[in-house]
Amino acid sequence: MINRKHQKGTMESRRNRRKQNKEKKGGLLIFFIIGIIGTIGGFVFNAMLNKQDIDEATNCPTDGVNYHKVILIDTSQSYNPIQKEWIKNQLKKIVYGTKENEKISVYTVGANYHETLLPLQSKCNPGDASGVNPFLENKRMKQEDWENEFIKPLNSVFKGLLDNDSEGLSPIMEMVQAISIAAFQNEKTSTKRELFIFSDMIQNSEVASHY
């Protein structure tokens, strides 16, 4: 004879175990979801906490940069195709070797350097899509900003300078001295400074000439 009471008790026991297992799994799932939300929240909070104030015109941190590269291109001379290609490659290395929030300023040698000594372009690298935080930024938009706000403005200036006809006077020594003061004087003490000069370094000014 089948013990129906025993069968009934066994079935109820199984149902209870299934119920307990479901409750455990549900609890673990809730804990896992809460853990993910907490982790994401931590990333977002940390990113917002460490976010720097950025100047919209230059893309540079308002409290200063850690590295400032100044490029001086001598337009008093004409460059042949081979020279242009070499200079373009060097400029590309400088630009693409510039890290996020580091600054590049471009100057040219001119006869009227003492009247106005402003960079033709001065931009900080806003960072490309490779360093995007997916919780805070859009990868495609970040890449477009990097190209439109950093790469294209600099390339446009470089092209204009290298394609220009020679301007005659080349006060290169005065320009190097003036730029060393004008470009770097407002930087933080801790800012690394570097000056790149593209010139034949032949002085040709009203004061002195090596021709």
Feature-to-residue mapping (PLM):
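N-terminal intrinsically disordered, acidic low-complexity segments at the extreme N-terminus
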Residues: 1-15
